[in-house]
């Protein structure tokens, strides 16, 4: 069990562990390639951050000025300890001498800068962003010769040499460097999803070739592999934090990225539908719902759960609420046993039962309900039944959450939803996909804190 807990630390990675092992070698050459907008500059800076190379690095940019880099990546100020420097001043070269503006350099001038660093600095990290701008000004023979010379000097100086390139085809440089990382992106329902391909890492076993990542907050962070065992290893030590003067009756999920995407707050009298790919563990839904319910309790909402869902959450996850008196149950017989021979009568009985149950609560009670659609199969079968159900619960509850674990008319549930969420598995990575109100993708992983499922917007 301990090994599973340890593995959860890799749910969210700065860079892939294989790449991390490679860049910690004493000397190497690395090519980061990919079309424009894939995140090459961000990855090269993230490698600097991973190496904690604050002084002995030399970043040559043929795309942006140092001023632009510090504007685009505000965290660079703290990382390079330049927070008190004004990079707009003329003495920029002295203040942040590790960053060089080479946009107007000729190949000979740039080449001289690099070789000087290789000769004068001990074990430097040198990044050329991008090599294309330099290579395009040289003929093929000069380019091949300069690339070989750089490799020779790099080995002698025990340096780390990193190139970026927009070239999609295999270049002469790719054949002589020690490592090649290729960045790409694709679109999933109007959402861009980024990937990192470990094409070659000399001397390092590559256990996983492709990682998905986000550029949220202008950092590159990769998502680890989905392991269903992690969702069964529940953190029972940390308690739900008591928030002093926590705002009452604010409808939010508690996941900042998700709340920001849907507009800050959940719709009052709204309907959220949640489901998952069939290959995924049921524990994902249960743990996600457990996190949601704990957040609603902190906001002073009362919860009305169907029997099966309540039993699973309270027994398996020991729902960590601050007032169990605010947790109510929809009895199982309410939808199944009293009128087995008459579907219409059975459905009417269910609505009467809920209405009577709700009428017994104080007038100012703010209720959120959580229901599995599977528990309603015997009374909900047609699109009109679903429309009637959704209309009823909208009127009765501040918020309604339906767990879609039945195959009956799923499209109608989608159409009735204000927010539709689905856990999906892509390339071994777990994501939460939001299709309604607008398409978005969130990397989902386990953390050793509360809430235990973490969501990070894929940007």
Q: At which residue positions do the language-model features occur?
A:
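Charged, amphipathic alpha-helical linker segments immediately N-terminal to NTP-binding catalytic cores
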Residues: 1-3, 202-246
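Pre-Walker A adenine-sensing motif
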Residues: 9-23, 253-266
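Short hydrophobic/aromatic beta-strand immediately N-terminal to the Walker A/P-loop
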Residues: 29-33, 271-275
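Conserved P-loop
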Residues: 31, 35-96, 279-339
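Structural recognition of the conserved hydrophobic beta-strand(s) that form the central parallel beta-sheet
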Residues: 59, 127-129, 156-166, 304-305, ...
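Phosphate-binding/switch loop-helix module in NTP-utilizing enzymes
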Residues: 95-155, 336-395
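Long, basic/Gly/Ser/Thr-rich N-terminal segments
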Residues: 105-224
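Phosphate-binding/switch region of NTP-binding enzymes
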Residues: 163-219, 399-459
């Amino acid at each position: 069990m301990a090994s599973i807990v340890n593995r959860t630390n890799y749910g969210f990675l700065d860079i892939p562990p294989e790449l991390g092992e490679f860049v910690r070698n004493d000397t190497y050459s690395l090519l980061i390639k990919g079309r424009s907008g894939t995140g090459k500059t961000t990855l090269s800076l993230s490698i600097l951050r991973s190496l904690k190379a604050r002084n002995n690095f030399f970043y040559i940019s043929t795309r942006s000025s140092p001023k632009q880099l510090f504007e685009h990546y505000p965290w660079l100020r703290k990382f390079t300890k330049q927070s008190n420097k004004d990079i707009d001043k003329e003495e920029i070269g002295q203040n942040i001498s590790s960053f060089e503006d080479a946009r107007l350099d000729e190949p000979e001038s740039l080449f001289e800068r690099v070789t000087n660093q290789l000769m004068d600095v001990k074990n430097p990290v040198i990044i050329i962003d991008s090599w294309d701008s330099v290579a395009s000004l040289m003929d093929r023979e000069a380019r091949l010769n300069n690339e070989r010379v750089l490799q020779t000097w790099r080995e002698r100086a025990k340096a780390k040499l990193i190139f970026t390139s927009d070239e999609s085809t295999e270049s002469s440089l790719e054949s002589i460097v020690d490592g090649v990382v290729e960045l790409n992106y694709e679109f999933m329902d109007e959402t861009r999803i980024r990937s990192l391909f470990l094409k070659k890492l000399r001397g390092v076993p590559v256990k996983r070739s492709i990682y998905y990542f986000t550029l949220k907050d202008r950092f590159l962070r990769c998502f680890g592999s989905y392991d269903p065992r992690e969702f069964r290893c529940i953190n029972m030590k940390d308690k739900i934090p008591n928030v002093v003067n926590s705002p009452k009756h604010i409808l939010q999920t508690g996941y900042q990225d998700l709340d920001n995407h849907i507009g800050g707050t959940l719709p009052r009298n709204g309907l959220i539908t949640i489901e998952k790919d069939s290959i995924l563990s049921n524990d994902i839904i249960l743990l996600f719902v457990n996190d949601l319910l704990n957040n609603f309790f902190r906001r002073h909402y009362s919860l009305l759960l169907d029997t099966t869902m309540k039993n699973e959450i309270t027994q398996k996850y020991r729902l960590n609420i601050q007032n169990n008196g605010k947790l109510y149950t929809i009895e199982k017989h309410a939808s199944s046993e009293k009128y087995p021979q008459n579907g219409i009568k059975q459905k009417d009985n269910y609505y009467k039962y809920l209405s009577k149950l709700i009428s017994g609560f104080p007038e100012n009670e703010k209720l959120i309900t959580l229901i599995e659609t599977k528990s309603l199969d015997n009374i909900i079968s047609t699109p009109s039944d679903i429309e009637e159900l959704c209309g009823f619960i909208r009127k009765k509850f501040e918020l309604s959450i339906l767990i879609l674990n039945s195959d009956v008319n799923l499209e109608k549930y989608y159409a009735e939803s204000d927010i539709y969420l689905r856990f999906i598995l892509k390339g071994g990575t777990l994501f939460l996909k939001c299709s309604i109100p607008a398409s978005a993708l969130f990397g989902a992983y386990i953390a050793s804190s509360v809430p235990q499922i973490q969501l990070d917007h894929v940007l």
